[in-house]
Swiss-Prot record:
It comes from Bos taurus. One of its GO terms (molecular function) is zinc ion binding. The keyword Nucleus applies. One of its GO terms (cellular component) is nucleus. It is found in: Nucleus. InterPro entries: Matrin/U1-like-C_Znf_C2H2 (IPR003604), ZN346_ZMAT4 (IPR051868), Znf_C2H2_jaz (IPR022755), Znf_C2H2_sf (IPR036236), Znf_C2H2_type (IPR013087). SMART domains: ZnF_C2H2, ZnF_U1. This is Zinc finger matrin-type protein 4. The gene is ZMAT4. PANTHER family: ZINC FINGER MATRIN-TYPE PROTEIN 4 (PTHR46144:SF3), ZINC FINGER PROTEIN 385B-LIKE (PTHR46144). Keywords: DNA-binding, Metal-binding, Nucleus, Repeat, Zinc, Zinc-finger. Residues 117-137 are annotated as: Disordered.
Length: 229
């Protein structure tokens, strides 16, 4: 095939195969074929695909070399298939990432593997050792034989289970828990009297339950007597 036939195949009125450019109108065709970009790509194309069928030039000219068969590295980079308008542009390319990456691939060097970020969902929170919650001695179940809170004895575990789930035990447990809560606000005399009965010595009144006693302590009458005491 003649070189003219090759040129006609590469450069048609509607498509430039060297630049992979679609040419729609006459003005676009003329502007493209006369552009500097097209000329540079054509020059590089024939460097890589000589018309005489010989091997493409792959060696770069040395600093003082005069070998005409070698390619000027300041004009084009055969490795990246790029042409340059000046030595400054060429130097910028050779120091860039694209050229360095292709050079590593050519030399067979392995590119470092990218470290993948660990998903947040797979990160486990640090373990925090917390002290075990110790129940109040009045709330926990003493044994299957005896309940110290209610002073009750059991013949078997089933009877003990029924007692601990019953109203009497729960009421006594709630009463003791409330006494422990009130212990921070009452003096020892009031606390000892409360353990025997539900009587308020400040107001000289007796209540029927620990709940009523607790409500009385929060009432306005008790607060007034407490201030005037």
């Amino acid at each position: 095939m003649k070189s003219s036939d090759i040129d006609q195949d590469l450069f048609t009125d509607s498509y430039c195969k060297v630049c992979s450019a679609q040419l729609i109108s006459e003005s676009q065709r003329v502007a493209h074929y006369e552009s500097r970009k097209h000329a540079s790509k054509v020059r590089l194309y024939y460097m890589l695909h000589p018309r005489d069928g010989g091997c493409p030039a792959k060696r770069l000219r040395s600093e003082n070399g005069n070998d005409a068969d070698m390619v000027d590295k300041n004009k084009c980079c055969t490795l990246c298939n790029m042409s340059f308008t000046s030595a400054v542009v060429a130097d910028s390319h050779y120091q860039g990432k694209i050229h360095a990456k292709r050079l590593k691939l050519l030399l067979g060097e392995k590119t470092p593997l990218k470290t993948t970020a660990t998903p947040l969902s797979s990160l486990k929170p640090p373990r925090v050792d917390t002290a075990p919650v110790v129940p109040s001695p009045y709330q926990r179940r003493d044994s299957d034989r005896y309940c110290g809170l209610c002073a009750a004895w059991f013949n078997n575990p089933l009877m003990a289970q029924q007692h601990y789930d019953g109203k009497k035990h729960k009421k006594n447990a709630a009463r003791v828990a409330l006494l422990e809560q009130l212990g921070t606000t009452l003096d020892m005399g009031e606390l000892r009297g409360l353990r025997r009965n539900y009587r308020c010595t400040t107001c000289s009144v007796s209540l029927n339950s620990i709940e009523q006693y607790h409500a009385h302590l929060k009432g306005s009458k008790h607060q007034t007597n407490l201030k005037n005491k």
